[in-house]
């Protein structure tokens, strides 16, 4: 609790009182003069004179010439402050700081002090600096650290040197925010050795960004020796607090086994979490891991889904470069690989004028290598009735073959067929759910969306909004949310359905995430292939 009495600000030009000899006869005259002055002040204050209002407030605050009354003091300060009286605003801040006439509120006090300073009250800054020099007031240390760190209008310019002076004092008083700010100033100046102790101090108190920065420093040898194991420990804490950069950095360490044990599955989990926060590199990394079968079962369709999304977020050049770069020696290009052939075949299928005959030739080669998704795509070729060789029996045979090999895309397509029914297959509600579930378990996000839609609407299955939300969230984590799924999930947050709290902002953000169709169509129509060797 603050014990330092702060100076009240007043500037009203009231009639000065002559000093009198303290005798019995002088007292009534002095009291009478005070009463006259207070009455004049009150009349002026009631007429809206902000100087009079502020001065009257100081009288009631201090008990000068009137009986002390904090409530009345605050009333007059407030009236003057509404007229932008700079010193009255500061005096209101004092009331909030000390809890005089109102409940103590340090945040509001700082807000009012900064408003007063910004409006030109340099005297307040000087007063607080003097107070710190005399009494080491924690409140004033934090206030001064804040205004010098951020600047405060034209009255106080941003000053890192003075900011550091007060931030260090505040950090010594266990202010996490001050420690982070001091570290940030040093970090921006690339004075890493000076920054690290402050980041460590804040990290020790659980500050997520500081935990990430400690991990970054230890990982990259900034201001300290490289220690990947210690870095990973810090990064893990920050990642669990949803810091995307920490997720990425820890994911990279786990992916490479750099200083810690390699773990593709954990790396994948972290990349997906970062991808859900729209980190394009994380989106790309997930796609690469599906392409390579690292930490997950290899699946070219899911890989392409992720890579196409990354391409739409600015990484198309990466895709194009690797597509035509050879996979030899130290180069990790895709040219003449199975994935290259898969993408090549897909371009013929996704063209504005599909060439299924050419696609089938390429896919048949892949199918002979037991690449399940090739069977699925062959089925898709025969499913298109615009092709003269369309054949529903062949379509079903290929889908079922791929589904037996646990290809999620095949199960997804089968679920759609069982839902609608066709000449090749009868509608079967039970098989719809089973196939969607298999596709979902295989990581195919559109299947998760469809399951969510079923539980949201109560079609085929018993309506269960909570279960629908779980599928939608899982779909988001797996890189895709259909327009219908996004609208349904948004409505849950808009109305507070399925156990989620009403949140209009979250609803709005989710609605924006909805996608129509496949992201890969635009990518496949915009890439070029060099001639095969």
Tell where the protein language model's regions lie, with residue ranges.
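TPR/TPR-like (Sel1-like) alpha-helical repeat modules
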Residues: 104-121, 298-315, 473-475, 487, ...
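Short helix-capping/linker turns of helical repeat alpha-solenoids
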Residues: 46-49, 62-64, 82-85, 98-100, ...
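Terminal, low-structured helical/coil segments at or just beyond the last alpha-helical repeat
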Residues: 22-24, 127, 131, 320-340, ...
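Sec-dependent signal peptide cleavage junction
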Residues: 12-38, 43, 106, 334, ...
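Hydrophobic face of amphipathic alpha-helices that form TPR/SEL1-like repeat modules
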Residues: 55-62, 91-98, 127, 131, ...
């Amino acid at each position: 609790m603050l014990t330092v009495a702060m100076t009240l600000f007043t500037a009203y030009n009231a009639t000065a009182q002559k000093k009198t000899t303290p005798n019995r006869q002088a007292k009534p005259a002095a009291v009478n003069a005070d009463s006259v002055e207070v009455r004049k002040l009150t009349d002026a204050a009631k007429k809206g004179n902000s100087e009079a209002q502020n001065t009257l407030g100081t009288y009631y605050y201090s008990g000068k010439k009137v009986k002390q009354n904090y409530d009345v003091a605050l009333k007059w300060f407030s009236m003057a402050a509404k007229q932008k009286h700079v010193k009255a605003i500061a005096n209101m801040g004092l009331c909030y700081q000390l809890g005089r006439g109102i409940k103590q509120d340090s945040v509001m006090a700082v807000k009012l002090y900064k408003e007063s300073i910004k409006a030109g009250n340099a005297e307040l800054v000087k007063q607080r600096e003097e107070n710190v020099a005399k009494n080491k007031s924690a409140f004033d240390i934090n206030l001064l650290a804040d205004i010098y760190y951020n600047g405060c209008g034209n009255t106080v310019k941003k000053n890192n040197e003075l900011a550091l002076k007060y931030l260090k004092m505040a950090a010594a008083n266990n202010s996490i925010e001050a420690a982070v700010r001091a570290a940030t100033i040093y970090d921006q100046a690339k004075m890493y050795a000076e920054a690290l102790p402050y980041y460590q101090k804040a990290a020790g108190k659980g500050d997520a960004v500081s935990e990430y920065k400690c991990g970054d420093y230890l990982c990259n040898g900034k201001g300290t020796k490289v220690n990947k194991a210690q870095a990973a420990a810090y990064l893990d804490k920050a990642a669990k607090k949803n810091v995307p950069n920490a997720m990425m950095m820890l994911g990279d360490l786990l992916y490479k086994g750099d200083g810690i044990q390699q773990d593709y599955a954990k790396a994948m989990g972290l990349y997906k979490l970062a991808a859900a926060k729209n980190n394009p590199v994380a989106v790309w990394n997930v796609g690469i891991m599906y392409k390579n079968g690292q930490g997950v079962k290899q699946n070219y369709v899911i890989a392409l889904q992720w890579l196409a999304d990354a391409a739409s977020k600015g990484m198309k050049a990466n895709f194009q470069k690797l597509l035509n770069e050879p996979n030899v020696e130290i180069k990790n290009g895709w040219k003449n690989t199975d994935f290259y052939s898969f993408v090549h075949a897909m371009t013929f299928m996704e063209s504005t004028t599909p060439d299924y005959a050419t696609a089938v030739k390429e896919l048949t080669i892949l199918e002979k290598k037991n690449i399940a998704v090739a069977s699925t795509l062959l089925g898709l070729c025969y499913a298109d009735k615009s092709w003269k060789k369309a054949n529903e029996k062949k379509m079903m045979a290929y889908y079922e073959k791929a589904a037996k090999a646990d290809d999620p895309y095949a199960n997804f397509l089968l679920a759609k067929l069982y839902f609608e029914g066709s000449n090749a297959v009868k509608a079967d509600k039970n098989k719809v759910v089973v196939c969607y579930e298999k596709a979902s378990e295989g990581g195919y996000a559109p299947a998760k969306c469809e399951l969510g839609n079923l539980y949201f609407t109560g079609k085929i299955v018993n309506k269960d909004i909570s279960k629908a939300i779980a599928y939608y969230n899982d779909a988001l984590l797996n890189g895709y949310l259909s327009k219908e799924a996004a609208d349904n999930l948004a409505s849950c947050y808009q109305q507070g359905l399925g156990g989620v709290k009403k949140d209009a902002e979250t609803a709005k953000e989710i609605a924006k995430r909805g996608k129509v169709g496949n992201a890969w169509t635009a990518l496949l129509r915009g890439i070029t292939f060099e001639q095969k060797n």
